Amino acid sequence: MSVAVSRAYELGVKEVSIPSAGNAAGAMSAYAALAGIKSYVFMPKDVPSPFISECKALGAEVTLIDGLITDCGKAASEGVKKYGRFDISTLKEPYRIEGKKTMGYELAEQFDWNLPDVIIYPTGGGTGLIGMWKAFDEMEQLGWIDSQRPRMVTVQSYGCAPIVKAFEDNTEFAELWNDAHTIADGLRVPAAVGDFLMLRSLRESNGIAIAGSDEKMLDSANLIGRTQGIFASPEGGATLAAFLKLRETNWIKETETVVLFNTGSGHKYSHLWESD
C-alpha cells in the first residue's frame, strides 16, 4: 500500500478511494494522511468496529455499505467515476502488487536465497499470493534464485471459498460465492479480480487450495498466541489450521520448511475473545 499511495502522490493525486474489509483501508488511510491526500473508504457495515475507528482516526471519510466487499467495490467505483478519485482497489492499479512482492524478496533474503518448501497464505483478494509469485519469477531472471519454487497454499473459509472451489473444479476463473460468511473479514471476498492469477500460481507450483471452519481458525489463532506469543488474527489462525490438516495427510512432510503468513492482528477482532 505504501508503494501505491507514494506513486499516487508522485502523480499529483489529491483523492484516493478503496473498498475494504479492514486492513487495506487502514493502511491506505495512514499513508494518505502522511502524504496529505484525502482518502475515501467503503466498508461492509458489519466489519469489527476497530477497523472503522482506525480509518476515521487517520482522517478517512468512511462509508458503511449494507453488503459485502463486492458491494463496496461498486460504491467506490461510482465515486471514482464521478469525482475522478484514484482507485486503489485490488488490481485496479499496478502499484500495490509491486509493494506486496517485497514479501517474496524479504523471504528469499531471510532464507539465504533458498526458498522454503511450502508457503501458506490466507486469501481474500489474493494480492499477497500474486505479488510473491511475481517476485520469485523476477529473482530467477536476476539470477538470485534457481527455478525451484515453494508449493503455494491458499487458505479460505468454508463460508467463502471461491478459489478453493475453482481449484478443485479445475477451472481458470472462480464463480461468485453466494451467501459469503466468515469471522475472518479479510477472507470474506466472494469474487476476486485476480482469481485466475492466484489459481495459476497454485497450479504452477503444484500447490493446493484448502478451506477450514471458523472454529478451527480461532482455535489455531489461540494456539499461535500460547506457543509463539503472537496475537494472530483469524486469518493467521487459518494458516496454522491448514498446516495441521496438510501435515496430517502427509501433503506436507516432516522434513519440509514451511512459512505461514499472519496478515493481521487479533486486537481488531477482540470481540471474538470477549466471551472467553
Kindly label every feature range from the protein language model.
Residues 4, 8-29, 35-43, 115-125, ...:
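A short, small-residue-rich loop immediately preceding and capping a beta-strand
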Residues 175-181, 237-276:
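Phosphate-binding loop/pocket of nucleotide- and phosphate-handling active sites
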Residues 39-115, 167-172, 180-199, 210:
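Small/polar-residue-rich loop-to-helix segments that shape phosphate-bearing ligand pockets
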Residues 69, 92-94, 123-127, 134-136, ...:
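Glycine-rich beta-alpha junction loops
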